[in-house]
Amino acid sequence: MKRKQESKGAGEKRQGAGGRGQGEKKQGKQGRQGRQGRQGEKSPVPSPQSPIPNPQFTTPNPDEWLQIGKIVSAQGLSGEVRVYPDSDFPERFEVPGTRWLLRPGQTEPQPIELLHGRYLENKNLYVLQLAGVENRSQSEELRGCMLFVPASDRPELGEDEYHVVDLIGMEVFLQASGDLVGAVVDVIPAGNDLLEVSLHEPVTSDKKPKTVLIPFVKAIAPVVDLQTRRIEITPPPGLLELGSGV
């Protein structure tokens, strides 16, 4: 199974792949390690020169945008930027075309042209050259900005592949008994991705719900039904006792 991530409004992932997800990631075949990406193009190019107004983000409409990455630092002196990917599709960062840039304090991403990009091995980062960003000072101003593509550019996935955003909120049941375990609240990257599941507790409980990490592999999560929003698991003994939280 694969997770493909590109968080909606925030990213896409695949089941059994690596990568984190408020972004675009795909849930992939179990045991496969994922890299990130896929691309969107069009629109004019804004000049990314104004300083970042403040550190607060307003999340764009998740039905309209997929977050693919975050600019984390400048790279060199020629205006390149380093991007932490929220996408399992390398094309998002390596194929020229239009992307959308959201600055802190803004509410709508603005189009900007990707000229070229490359992957930094062993760092899980991409280095991008964006149009209009020609020196280190300009690239430093983009630190903390988020990159998006339109939700309409969401790629088709293969068998046993899932968008992380579709997994969030799905209910998890024990396959053998049908008992409700809880609901997926996050997908955490690892050699095989982990579903973070908030355990079901009576509504009268005043305690913070406990969570448990469940490997997102076919052997443990054999049923993932997007239509009914249901995941069935066959956890090994002791797995559900390893919850965290109070």
From Swiss-Prot:
HAMAP family, A to Z: Ribosome_mat_RimM
One GO cellular component, as annotated: ribosome
Gene3D superfamilies referenced in this protein's UniProt entry, alphabetically: PRC-barrel domain, RimM
Listed GO biological process terms: ribosomal small subunit biogenesis; rRNA processing
Pfam families with a match to the protein in the record: PRC_RimM, RimM
Domain PRC barrel residues, every copy: 158-239
Gene Ontology MF: a single term: ribosome binding
Gene: rimM
Protein's name in the database: Ribosome maturation factor RimM
Region of interest (Disordered), ranges: 1-63
Biased composition (Pro residues): 45-54
Protein family per UniProt: Belongs to the RimM family.
Coiled-coil residue windows: none
Biased composition (Basic and acidic residues): 1-15
Free-text domain note: The PRC barrel domain binds ribosomal protein uS19.
Database matches in NCBIfam families: 16S_RimM
Role played: An accessory protein needed during the final step in the assembly of 30S ribosomal subunit, possibly for assembly of the head region. Essential for efficient processing of 16S rRNA. May be needed both before and after RbfA during the maturation of 16S rRNA. It has affinity for free ribosomal 30S subunits but not for 70S ribosomes.
Keyword list, A-Z: Chaperone, Cytoplasm, Ribosome biogenesis, rRNA processing
Cell compartments where the protein resides: Cytoplasm
PANTHER family to which the protein is assigned, alphabetical: RIBOSOME MATURATION FACTOR RIMM
